[in-house]
Swiss-Prot record:
Protein name: Hemoglobin and hemoglobin-haptoglobin-binding protein B
Molecular function as annotated in GO: siderophore uptake transmembrane transporter activity
Any GO CC annotation of this UniProt entry: cell outer membrane
NCBIfam families per UniProt: TonB-hemlactrns
Region feature Disordered, mapped onto this chain: 26-53
PANTHER family for the chain: HEMOGLOBIN AND HEMOGLOBIN-HAPTOGLOBIN-BINDING PROTEIN 1-RELATED (PTHR30069:SF29), TONB-DEPENDENT OUTER MEMBRANE RECEPTOR (PTHR30069)
Record's miscellaneous remark: This protein is subject to phase-variable expression associated with alteration in the length of the CCAA repeat region. This mechanism is called slipped-strand mispairing. Addition or loss of CCAA repeat units would change the reading frame and result in introduction of stop codons downstream of the repeat region. This may be a mechanism of regulation and a way to avoid the immunological response of the host.
Record's subcellular location: Cell outer membrane
Coiled-coil segments: none
Gene coding for it: hgbB
Amino acid sequence: MTNFKFSLLACSIAFALNASTAYAAQPTNQPTNQPTNQPTNQPTNQPTNQNSNVSEQLEQINVSGSSENINIKEKKVGETQISAKKLAKQQASDSRDLVRYETGITVVETGRTGASGYAVRGVDENRVGIMVDGLRQAETLSSQGFKELFEGYGNFNNTRNSIEIENVKTATITKGADSLKSGSGALGGSVIFETKDARDYLIDKDYYLSYKRGYQTMNNQNLKTLTLAGRSKKFDILVVDTKRDGHEIENYDYKIYPNKQADLRAVGPTREKADPYQITRQSTLIKLGFQPNENHRLSVALDDSTLETKGIDLSYALRPYSTAGNEKYGERIINDQSKRKNIQFSYENFSQTPFWDHIKLSYSSQKITNKARSDEYCHQSTCPGVRNPQGLHLVEKDGTYRIVDKDNNDFHYKKDDSDLWAWGKELHNSKGKKISDDVDTKGGSLDSVLINCEKLDCSKRFRIYQEYDENSSEKYTYDDREIKVETLPNGKKYGKIPLKKGEKLFSQEEARFLFPKSHGYSTDFVNDRDLNTHTQQIKLDLDKEFHLWHTQHQLKYGGLYEKTLKSMVNHQYNTAANVQWWADYFFCARQEGGNLGGEKKPRPDISVAGCANGTLLHSDIGKDTYLIPVTTKNNVLYFGDNVQLTSWLGLDLNYRYDHVKYLPSYDKNIPVPKGLITGLFKKFKSTDYVYGKKYSKPDGYTDCTYDTPCYKQNFKDNLALLLRKTDYKHHSYNLGLNLDPTDWLRVQLKYANGFRAPTSDEIYMTFKHPQFSIQPNTDLKAETSKTKEVAFTFYKNSSYITLNAFQNDYRNFIDLVEVGERPIEEDSVVRYPFHQNQNRDRARVRGIEIASRLEIGDLFEKLQGFHLGYKFTYQKGRIKDNGLHPKYKEFLKLNKDQHPEYEAIARKPQPMNALQPTTSVYNIGYDAPSQKWGVDMYITNVAAKKAKDSFNSQWTSMVERKEKQYTDITDIKASKANGKEVKDSRGLWRNNRYTVIDTIAYWKPIKNLTFTAGVYNLTNKKYLTWDSARSIRHIGTINRVKTETGKGLNRFYAPGRNYRMSVQFEF
């Protein structure tokens, strides 16, 4: 394999170095005055990007022909375009597959909630822009404080939403600062998606129909996609409906447990198999266009998708799980959803004027909801809340309901001869076995139990058990009684069986229903949390081509106004789950307040078992939030000009102005807990009595306990200080120089900048706790980046090699910093350790990239259709501070004597975990001249992540140290990771070098039918990706392994050998 790699690389370099002599007599590529994306005033039966035929062919990536043609003159530095056809050929199904064969970009892994955006040039998630049809996608709550407090416990679906791959027309990946296109957030790069349009299919016909079925073994995913496109006179329509149904991605050694019982018993961080989830995605894309003439077009689009994940968090670290015999206590059931709905209206005009050749006005409304719901309850039949060891069940026979034993027979009472101390009679089953210990023979009185007539037929009789009649005579017998039907205030029917009254005052019978000695349900502790992003945007785009003196210009300009509301809703409540028949068919009759002697009223919200103490089946503490809702308003103006000065010299001049405003608000219906805000800026006075019981207030103090006017006023004052408006202004630019000194060499230089305004949670998040508190910071600066890049491209015809060197400089990185202990009241000895988001000084990433493709048919005529490809990325980077980072101050002060080496560790530049290890991707392929079949082999080689290039953000809490715990200084031993003591800041888990081979083939037996199949990880290599390794958490309850031994790491390994196949019919 090593020899092969060097021979392929040598072949590519040899081609580049000899291009000028081998093809000196060949004609050059098309001149650069050919427009690339120029809209036209053609009717709808023409393609939208109407250029010359040659330029159109060069721009597209032809994946079914013999070559993948790329117009070198139109290729931007650090930019890659991936077409729908290429994605289909590679059988891409998600964001991971989108970048599978790209280098220098990977997805961010989060475990249960899947991928969360991309990592490019040393930054990830919110620092890499994602856009779909011109709209920025939802950002994560990126505050490190939020991640420390909430993300690691699986209570939020804090990920960036993805897009359905079947809807994608083109995906443009830009590496390096790209705020020009994406605005705030594109520090390291951007991924911009454009969805399909009816005109893509209706170039030479009036209808198109496609049905695609696919399957992949790594997650048992079934794919169904129906695509319809049609045109009738002035109207055209496109419908793409896609459904994916599968389960979790199967890690290597997925079948490690011998059976289902062993699988379900393997719980906690040491679990070696991926947690079981059922994952479905439903996506619908509809576009309707109306073009009354060649100069005007109106369109409306709907892009609606839902990604849903259901399953069990078996690896959950703090799941309330224990075993006692065969009984189980507690399971964590999850139901996550990511919903995105975008409605867009647009008007286009193709009339040529002195100011534009094409103008487009669009309005978009996009709503994104990322939901994370967890239900923690015991759902087995052996759970304490539903125990029914005698198998009691309800039957109906001859018009009478009866509660019988597991043998369908009645019970009977008799004296317990086995117990000399027994008093009275005990309940026995039909086989004479005593069952009083498992059946409630003291509760279930007829006057406390009501029958749910919505679920049982109350016109029938019910067999009850009478112990004493109304005259206090012993009976211990059955009696079939009529059910008296009454109506609840909501109109629903219920039934009751009154106790018989005796002749004496207050005398009545003792009669009851016999139920199992358990509640009949498990208490379900529900966490239902939503992260909502609602964006409205008005955008105006114009472009114009013109000649000025001897120069050619492609001018693009416009602006937009965007308003985004970001909010969180936290809903916690308890309800009944795993409900059994005696809690489902019956409910409580209870006097108000639980008092005795009064009238008992129906309480359908209380079970029979909870009747005595009034325990509610469903208790709701209401909705609240940990983040105040924030509206972001963004005003944008942009200008870009592609200038061709001469046949060999061109300029790219681009500028954008952003003005971002944050407008925080407060919703009384979904409040922030008052305790998080009181005393935040304006402290309570030293004479204010805030914490403790009202009756314990000392003399001379003011009562400021919860809900007092004093407390409310402090909350109001601090809230006003928190709701400060903030704004950010930024000038983005992208300058490029394109040189074509010969017909085989192109030199490009790029200088660009980008920015990221702080997210609302980074500015406004507040939290107070004796062990971890967060102070808001409305003075944060925007993060910035600058990219310097140079590229040399040697090319001829469809073959090329690009050598690229880059440098990215980042400033003002936002990080969570420990700002020291602060009193929560004036002159108080009670001090909380506070943290705050602050700006760090700088970071730098440098690297080189190679991208090449060789059409072997250009060298040897007999080898037409064969091609070779090679991509390579190497990058290094560090975060640097001027001086010591503030978060280490207290730690070093405590440990300077015993561990002076820690200061050197704290002061050295910090490695950037978002940098991928050195990666190479080789491609060998063949496309038959008939375009009826082809095959590609991709070889991906990833180097090991070096220890010195990784960083453990928790190292100060893992090394041997002195630690302040409240007022005491304690010696803490070093934690172990994979059997070794942690001694420095190097990452705990890293990937080894690995090589993965994928083989993909397609076959078109007839024009309308395409088969595609692939074998992935052909050699069944066991490997761990760096992005999966760095997703493993040391604290929290999800994405954990047993740090001391490394047990559970197998759960994070990539799939072994797996297969994909698809079939597509097109008409």
